[in-house]
Amino acid sequence: MMVIVAWQMYDITRSAYDLGLVGLAQFVPALALCLIVGQVADRFDRRLILVGCLLVQFCVALVLIAGTLGGWLGRDVILFASLGLGTARAFQQPTQQALLPALVSRDALPRALALASAAMQTATIAGPAIGGFIYVAGAARVYGTCAVMSLFAIAMVCLIRHPHASVAREPVTLKSLFAGIGFIWSR
């Protein structure tokens, strides 16, 4: 959906600057929230975080459908939608990555990580291509497809039966915010 939003922005405004703003609005949340999302993924039920992210994507798709069909979709709405998508993705990706090791055995983890990586790469390549083919029939159809897929993904996440391992609710400190960076740096 993120690529289609950019295409529609360009179709509406014919401005490369506005197209760049869409990319910026989608990227800035990941940068701004990078220290916080790890804390959230570690402290709360990852399934609920994923459902929340998918609900945001579903709602954004509905707004984009309504705006496209109603003829009121413009630059500001697209930028706000891009910011919403970027924020949802900022929480979704790290949460998905943190959930997988909790779902499979230690022995199966390397294969599961390889499969998840292959699936993500396939989706990254095929998603925009398929979206482009659907976009020919109209942007609202792409957003409708994304809305349906979001609901399907929510249903699949709700089927995950993994007890949430509760983390001690220590106060969030600067040290805890930077702990993830320290862990990565030590590797």
PLM features: residue spans?
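Alpha-helical transmembrane-bundle signature of multi-pass membrane transport and export proteins
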Residues: 1-187
